[in-house]
Structure formats: structure tokens, C-alpha cells
């Protein structure tokens, strides 16, 4: 099972240049927000309404070098990455607004 992280192409490109991805939420909240495939649509509506330029990162939890914790939010467990996202854990990217 993969988990997803929604970001902008610019933030993802910066992470690729850096060699690891660090979303601004990591310094603000201490973790990177993620979702399951089933949570994607609600996450887009709740947090990304009106934003057109988005990219979804597909992440293999088994390859994470940072801790992954499942924590309750909005009445259900969401995956949170507690540290930088190592690039080799990202198995692919896609436009989250396009049907798959």
C-alpha cells in the first residue's frame, strides 16, 4: 500500500534538487501531512480548493527513512511523516485532479 502527499510542482522540484523533500509543514508542525488513496478526494476539497497546480507523490511506507505515524484527524487516521521524505521512497507522481 502506498500513501500520498499533495504538494506543488515547485516544492517537489526543490526537494529533488536538495536530495530530500521537506514540506514547510515539517518545520511548522513537525511532520509532513499525507493521505491514503481513499482520503485523496476529501483532502483535495478540504485543503486545496481552488489550487490548480498540484502534484501527488506516491510513497512506499516501507522505504521511509523517517518515522511514519498514523494519527487521528477529522475522525479518521491519517499518515504523518516525522522528518524529511527520502526521495527513494517516492515510487511515482501524478496529477491528483485527473482520474486514474
Where do the protein language model's features map onto the residues?
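Conserved, structured core segments of small domains
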Residues: 1-100
Amino acid at each position: 500500500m502506498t500513501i500520498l502527499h499533495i504538494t506543488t510542482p515547485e516544492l517537489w522540484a526543490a526537494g529533488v534538487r536538495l536530495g530530500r523533500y521537506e514540506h514547510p509543514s515539517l518545520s511548522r508542525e513537525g511532520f509532513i501531512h499525507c493521505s491514503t488513496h481513499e482520503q485523496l478526494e476529501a483532502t483535495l476539497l478540504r485543503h486545496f480548493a481552488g489550487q490548480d497546480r498540484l502534484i501527488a507523490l506516491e510513497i512506499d511506507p516501507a522505504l521511509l527513512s523517517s518515522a511514519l505515524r498514523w494519527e487521528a484527524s477529522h475522525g479518521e487516521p491519517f499518515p504523518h511523516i516525522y522528518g524529511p521524505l527520502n526521495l527513494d521512497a517516492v515510487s511515482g507522481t501524478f496529477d491528483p485532479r485527473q482520474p486514474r
